[in-house]
UniProtKB/Swiss-Prot annotation:
Function of the protein: Catalyzes the decarboxylation of 3,4-dihydroxyphthalate to protocatechuate (3,4-dihydroxybenzoate) during phthalate metabolism.
Family: Belongs to the aldolase class II family.
Gene (name only): padC1
Entry protein name: 3,4-dihydroxyphthalate decarboxylase
Cofactor: a divalent metal cation
Catalytic residue positions: E86
Matches recorded under Pfam families: Aldolase_II
Cited InterPro entries: Aldolase_class_II_sugar_metab (IPR050197), Aldolase_II/adducin_N (IPR001303), Aldolase_II/adducin_N_sf (IPR036409)
Domain of life: Bacteria
Catalytic reaction(s) noted: 3,4-dihydroxyphthalate + H(+) = 3,4-dihydroxybenzoate + CO2
SUPFAM superfamilies documented for this protein: AraD/HMP-PK domain-like
Alphabetical UniProt keywords: Lyase, Metal-binding, Plasmid
């Protein structure tokens, strides 16, 4: 990527942080999103001495770093900027596949609560959120250690638990969502958080969680990227600006 592309990507990652915060997927100063710009360089949300939280992320908070945590270019870690302690979440996820360019490590409360309650996220609804139902149909794995993923070894453990799925629940912690785009990594997380919220509500009301009928999948089409990502993302960005 050239310098212009990198600057544009900073804007997108910062935007994604604000969207995730507005959606309640991360709170306060916790959580981070990244985007790979070359085989060993990524843009990632870093903290600084004047950080006011993820909901107020600026493009200048998105810093270019190497996979080893050092500055990716002169000045990138100046002015008190620090790489997240859980950088291995991002690095090991990206190392697992060249198709993974974006990683969102978030703390969605309903997902954490549902997992702790022993509730598996399954496709209990269809047209309410087709991408979310499809995601759940393939299964959502769980990394069963409630640790800060601050080492290469722990990052590899998480990636192993994730397997070939785009999202893994980190028990008592949060989730990691991976995708080819920053937007998709956040939208996947938002869909699963809504599914978890709905599942908790059904169980709390005394209901039973049941997968939709197999026959219904024939009439749950892929509405395409222009709708599922493009239109939805424009809404999320506009919504985040008003929260």
């Amino acid at each position: 990527m050239n310098e212009t592309d990198i600057e544009g990507a900073r804007v997108v990652v910062a935007e994604a942080c604000r969207v995730a915060a507005a959606r309640g997927l991360m709170e306060g100063i916790l959580g981070h999103i990244s985007f790979r710009v070359s085989p060993d360089l990524l843009l990632i949300r870093c903290r600084s001495a004047d950080d006011t939280g993820v909901a107020y992320t600026r493009p200048s908070d998105i810093r270019l770093v190497r996979f080893d945590g050092t500055a990716g270019a002169p000045g990138e870690l100046d002015n008190g900027y620090q790489v997240p302690k859980e950088l291995p979440v991002h690095v090991e996820s990206m190392r697992a596949s060249p198709d993974i360019r974006a990683v969102a490590h978030l703390h969605p409360p309903s997902i954490v609560a549902a997992d702790l309650a022993g509730i598996s996220l399954r496709p209990i609804y269809g047209a309410y959120d087709i991408p979310g139902a499809v995601l759940a149909r393939g299964g959502v794995p769980v990394y069963r250690r409630a640790v800060l993923i601050h080492s290469t070894q722990l990052g590899k453990e998480m990636v192993t638990a994730m397997g070939d799925r785009p999202v893994v629940i980190c028990r008592g912690h949060g989730i990691t969502s991976v995708a080819s785009s920053v937007q998709q990594s956040v939208l996947q997380a938002a869909s699963l958080e809504e599914l978890a919220r709905m599942s908790l509500a059904v169980v709390s009301a005394g209901g039973t969680l049941v997968d939709i009928d197999d026959a219904d999948w024939e009439d749950l089409p892929d509405l395409g990227a222009n709708f599922n990502t493009g239109a939805v993302w424009r809404h999320e960005v506009a919504r985040a600006a008003t929260v």
